[in-house]
């Protein structure tokens, strides 16, 4: 049995995102439909920008109003006529809304009943994923020594996921979900405390065994290696076991399953997640790390927030 690829970036972090922080679990994970082709228009390439500063989108304080705004954003994200700039802003607000709802289970009885039926599965999977990731988050008093770059083009990622699926039998949506949680599709550049590297956060020794001579920092090579690793750990017969071997946390397994199910069922989901921001969980709350963020060493969170108010 291959050695588990543990102590990935999310452990060190307290991150992300999708994330906002972390990783996931296994109780009553939703059934995942057969992977559907992501037919929505792939997002336009992301361009680096530090202004308007990475300030977080503002949400309504009232959960009823928040629900109304979330419905409007969800509909815009599924409307083929929505301009890219509007899609980006809707996705950013949606992400922050799910992060807030994840922290407030008392809002469930207010928000969920007013959602249109067609949005409930996507809502449920996102809220559950957030709560699972929160179990793995350890708020830090410093921001990480990372760089945040634009992710690779969406179509290049989708091609890599599909090629890995064809080679390994592991669903493209599971590979995309792991890529989302680990490094926001490769936006995050930085090693974990344990030494995990690259867009799929492999330990070098594990990548050497499953990467077939590829480059651990290559998005395509690391995605293909992840498919090989999961297949070798019995993904075809027991996906939960294989995902647990990838990162030894039940909450991680459940979050990956949630995001994978969302992408399999909803053609808009991948584009939505691709447009999300990178967040880091700190003792001062969630901090948005914009494209262009770069630190050679950890930065005290208070110092960063003074210069970059959220």
Cite the ranges covered by each PLM segment.
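N-terminal export signals and maturation junctions of secreted/periplasmic proteins
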Residues: 29, 50, 54-158
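C-terminal motif of bacterial Sec signal peptides marking the signal peptidase cleavage site
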Residues: 23-25
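Sec-dependent N-terminal signal peptides
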Residues: 13-19
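Bacterial N-terminal signal peptides that target proteins for export
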Residues: 2-13
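Extended, helix-rich structural scaffolds rather than catalytic motifs
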Residues: 295-310
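Catalytic glycan-binding domains that act on GlcNAc-containing polysaccharides
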Residues: 106-290, 306
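Intrinsic disorder/low-complexity detector
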Residues: 12, 43-49, 53
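Short, low-complexity, disordered segments immediately C-terminal to signal peptides
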Residues: 27-47
